[in-house]
Amino acid sequence: MSCRRVFFNYRALSLGRRCQRSSLRLSLGLIVLFCVLSPLRSFGAEADPKFKPGEELLDAGRIAQAEEFAAKVLKEEPKSPAALDFDARVKFYQGRYAEALAIVDRALAIDSSNQRRQALKLFSQLTLDVHKSLKPFESAHFVLFADEKRDGILVPYALDTLEKTYQTTGAELGFFPKEKVRVEIAPDATSFNAISTLSLRDIEETGAVGICKFNKLMIISPRALSFGYRWLDSLSHEYQHYAIVSLSNNQAPIWLHEGMARFYETRWRKPAPAKDAAEDYLTPANQTLLVHALEKNQFVGFKKMEPSLIYLETPEQVQLAYAEAASAVDFINQSKGRDGVRELLATLNDKATPEAIEKVYGMSFDNFESKWKGFLKSKGLKEIEGSRVRKLKVKKDQREDEEVVELKEIQSAVARNRTYLADQLFAKGRAAAAANEYQRALQASPRSPVILYKLGRIMVETNRPDDALPLFQQALEIDPDNVNIYVQLGRAEHAKKNFKEARAALEEAIQINPFNPLIYRLLGDAYAALGDQEKARAARTTLERLSASRN
């Protein structure tokens, strides 16, 4: 999700959840007032021309200059509620939440009737409440805040990915921020809603699991979602937004924001990317969506992506928009390479997008769109049968949620019913009978990654890893973001003593949902067999930590 537009989503302040936060000590009427207000551009006082330069500095991530601006206006009008509001926002953007709250209280003591000011107090309090459970962890260029007890195992992977992203993004875009970048991992959906303003609907319907906003990167813990999600790529994705805001002075359009973020989000995995690494954005589902868009000439279009992709109507539209935007960045890269991208971002500082495109690439924006579509057609994209846009699900009861979600992903009713029966047989220890039912289900839906994975799991359970491997490989060709497939693939390779391949599969699983203890039991063996005793010890330590947390 983009950080260019800084909106406060009042709808996200769910009445029920807010009422549960007794520490806020707010009246029911005040909470209702906040929930019915329409989205506004910023917190604080009503729009005042004198604060516009400061607002622009904040939105462009120029926090030090915004702080100087706040000091200047406060010196001129030390008792101005509007000046205090702006100073509070600066403190908030610096992560100084308690100070922001105290300053807002001072402004409210002077004028308590301003609704935006009341909302800023509420949001500052919510953020401060969440932050009380988070602990800071630092690396060379980042300060990461996470719940150590629940999400501590994420920290080393997150910081390693962020540092790799810092280097790969710097190499591509020439962006090397000197100040450490603030990152926050929300431990659950309620906390994520509180600090990000993204709602449960935004998570489950549009896949909004991360956001770059308020001068920081925020994601939800993969532990909070059934099956997790590509959380490390999401951290990298949000950092791309952070870079784009700075390099374009917050002037990049949403399609360029989201296109670049999607295009570059996997570069951290490949510091020296292979020739085809640029096409990592073409997941099976995204490629299929683009094929359909080309066939029907039904694109989301760059204009409809404004002001944010979360306002599109369906998950399919959101993912098509990402695919369109990323493919446009692919086209841009192939036109003039990284130098062209850097020049475009710099040109956007003082030119509108159409003029910037014309200056850098020598064509009108209409011509650019036309050539981009021609570029797409020339790629010869093919529909990947069985691929579907994955819908995220906030976890309630892990076992029940996963079983229900998996069954819903099977399109054929016949295959779904047979799979359900096979699941029941497997749960009762009747592996052979379950395998027969999974095979019957596969006859009705031969390209279902869920059924392929479940049948492969039975093969591993019955000591037939050679039969399991092709099933897992076929499933990954359709659904490369399914954590369960990687875990079972790692298990099969481990059974065959293919420890290098097992390590690769299990490390991929960590990138999606690192909370399965089996990952670390198998990884400990794989690392030890490959002679990496330090990583073997680390895997065993993580296993012990996860096991202890479940007792």
Residue ranges with predicted function:
Residues 59-60, 93, 127, 427, ...:
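Register position in tetratricopeptide repeats
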Residues 49, 131-257, 264-271, 279, ...:
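Juxtacatalytic substrate-recognition/specificity segment
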Residues 64, 93, 98, 272-318, ...:
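Amphipathic alpha-helical substructures
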Residues 76, 110, 444, 478, ...:
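Structural marker of alpha-solenoid helical repeat scaffolds
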Residues 46-48, 81-82, 115, 415, ...:
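Helix-start (N-cap) detector for alpha-helical repeat units in TPR-like alpha-solenoids
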